[in-house]
Amino acid sequence: MRIKNSGILLLAAILLFSCDKKRVFDEYKSVGSAWHKDSVVTFDLPVLDSTKKYNLFVNLRDNNNYPFNNLFLIVAIETPSGFTKVDTLEYQMANPDGTLMGNGFTDIKESKLYYKEDVKFKGKYKVHIKQAVRESGKIPGVEALEGITDVGFRIEQKD
């Protein structure tokens, strides 16, 4: 019985991981119960095949404590030469009725947000992500952004 259960578990694991063949990097980092405006989430990317193209995504886990309809992020890619390309991005996080977008059956949702397409990497890169949310009509940023629990970065190989 124990061998049969182990075999079923192994088969389930193989099926689960084989369904995601495009993934070459996928990592999350926790930001706790609130994402502080000065907290930068950094990912050290692996060295990838420089002849292939990749699609890049910012992944988020959020819950019903997220108080806004959209999200502003500052994403910086640091190249091996030290050059840094910075983008300010806006993503819709909630439907017009206020329910969170994303995948998940509980109050925790996962959102896979498109960042860049057809990117080639030549060497070792770093990605830095910080939140840049502001309340409507206010200049200072939200000090501690509630509702975002984890920030991730994902790289998929282009077909």
From Swiss-Prot:
<keyword id="KW-0732">Signal</keyword>
<keyword id="KW-0564">Palmitate</keyword>
<keyword id="KW-1003">Cell membrane</keyword>
<dbReference type="Pfam" id="PF14109">
    <property type="entry name" value="GldH_lipo"/>
</dbReference>
<feature type="lipid moiety-binding region" description="N-palmitoyl cysteine">
    <location>
        <position position="19"/>
    </location>
</feature>
<dbReference type="GO" id="GO:0071976">
    <property type="term" value="P:cell gliding"/>
</dbReference>
<feature type="signal peptide">
    <location>
        <begin position="1"/>
        <end position="18"/>
    </location>
</feature>
<feature type="lipid moiety-binding region" description="S-diacylglycerol cysteine">
    <location>
        <position position="19"/>
    </location>
</feature>
<protein>
    <recommendedName>
        <fullName>Gliding motility lipoprotein GldH</fullName>
    </recommendedName>
</protein>
<dbReference type="InterPro" id="IPR020018">
    <property type="entry name" value="Motility-assoc_lipoprot_GldH"/>
</dbReference>
<dbReference type="GO" id="GO:0006032">
    <property type="term" value="P:chitin catabolic process"/>
</dbReference>
<keyword id="KW-0449">Lipoprotein</keyword>
<keyword id="KW-0472">Membrane</keyword>
<comment type="function">
    <text>Required for gliding motility and chitin utilization.</text>
</comment>
<dbReference type="GO" id="GO:0005886">
    <property type="term" value="C:plasma membrane"/>
</dbReference>
